Amino acid sequence: HLCDRRQRQMCIRDSIYILLFSYLEHRPVHSYHIVHTVFDDWIPFCEFFIVPYMLWFPYMILAVIYFIFFNKNKHEYYQLAFNLMMGMTVFLIVSYVYPNAQHIRPTEFPRDNIFTDIVKWLYSTDTPTNILPSIHVFNSLAIHMSLTNCETLRNKKFIKAASFTLTALIIMSTMFLKQHSVIDVCMGATLALFGFLVFYPRRVSVSSESVCFREVKRKKSEN
């Protein structure tokens, strides 16, 4: 059965990724390369961004569930699956050969509320290591790409707008919560762009043809 096969494939990939990531998090490392830019110091800490940051998890899960159980287009499922697998693989390789970390998390919080309490919990469970490129950024963009390129969702403007808004807020949250440096975000976005060019080439070629067609039409009208 197609759904069963997709489930098995996703479970196997996720299990391998979790095991390898756990190894990278706990392996002995003599020194980490510190990731930091001056832009990180300009971005203020804002605990309210914990909301979109945590929404990343249901956003990912619900999108994957949709492509496994509800979307009948096998090609679109594999576009998303291979894109996510590519990003995770690059992330694991980078983390292995280039151990990295950041020191931009605040030691004191400007306010005391439920949002800062959740951030404190996040800091206690998520180490500031292996952050380059940002998987939060890459996966959010990969999910957004899959939804906007889904044939059955082509006319669902609300879903596309909601996905775009949430993706933008998730990316911003990684910086405002001091979970990632600007470099991590840029590298995650670059990796997502690479994935788009590789796994959605038809969309790229169609866009290029549209631009060329408009240019030819404009020149004809001028003549």
Give short role names for the model-derived ranges.
Residues D41-I61:
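Interfacial helix-start motif at the membrane-water boundary
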Residues L24-V38, F70-L153, S207-V211, E215:
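Membrane-interface loops
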Residues K120-E209:
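Membrane-embedded catalytic cores of phosphoryl/pyrophosphoryl-handling enzymes
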Residues P58-H75:
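Internal transmembrane alpha-helix with an interfacial aromatic "cap," most often the third helix
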Residues V51-M54, P58, Q79-N83, P133, ...:
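Alpha-helical transmembrane segments of integral membrane proteins
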Residues R5, V206-N223:
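Membrane-interfacial, low-structure loops and terminal tails that flank and connect transmembrane helices
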Residues H1-I12:
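Single conserved hydrophobic/aromatic residue that forms the stacking wall/gate
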